[in-house]
Amino acid sequence: MSSSVSSKTRYWVLALAAIVLDQWSKWAVLSSFQYRERVNVIPSFFDLTLVYNPGAAFSFLADQGGWQKYFFLVLAVAVSAYLVRAILRDEFATLGKTGAAMIIGGALGNVIDRLIHGHVVDFLLFYWQNWFYPAFNIADSFICVGAVLAVLDNIVHRKTQEEKY
């Protein structure tokens, strides 16, 4: 078991790095911006801003009555626990474990926000003319990239399994 745990250290380091990067970036924005303040980074395309999101990634369910805070808190912890178990049991190949670690780090980064602030801190705002993508944060990015890696791992693994038969 100890060799199994030590071989997985890189995934725990990745998850921790995601949490640290996410929390540091949010601290920097909270320390430097007023609520809804915007600073243009790339004209007509990308701003830094400070907004609060009581919903999920990309403001999903943000306009609900408050129940979603607890729902997404429990969901993030449950998904993270499942993914930790899956990594420990080698249920994924390397790409899937990397994706799972990224999802864990992103999910727990947003859990920390919900516990400390009662909402998630978002600050990355992409737009084009009158079209705005919902503001998001580093944790959301880790979750999305991790999900893509997990899906790719599943596709590759499934194809490999089919080739065996």
Swiss-Prot record:
Q: GO MF terms on file?
A: aspartic-type endopeptidase activity; endopeptidase activity
> What is the protein name given in its UniProt record?
Lipoprotein signal peptidase
Organism of provenance: Neisseria meningitidis serogroup B (strain ATCC BAA-335 / MC58)
Q: What is stated as this protein's family in its record?
A: Belongs to the peptidase A8 family.
Q: Where is the active site?
A: D122, D140
* EC assignment: 3.4.23.36
Pathway listed for it is: Protein modification; lipoprotein biosynthesis (signal peptide cleavage)
What is the predominant subcellular site recorded for this chain?
A: membrane
Broad class of enzyme this protein falls into: hydrolase
Q: Say which domain of life the source belongs to.
A: Bacteria
What is this protein's function?
Answer: This protein specifically catalyzes the removal of signal peptides from prolipoproteins.
Q: Which UniProt keywords apply?
A: Aspartyl protease, Cell inner membrane, Cell membrane, Hydrolase, Membrane, Protease, Transmembrane, Transmembrane helix
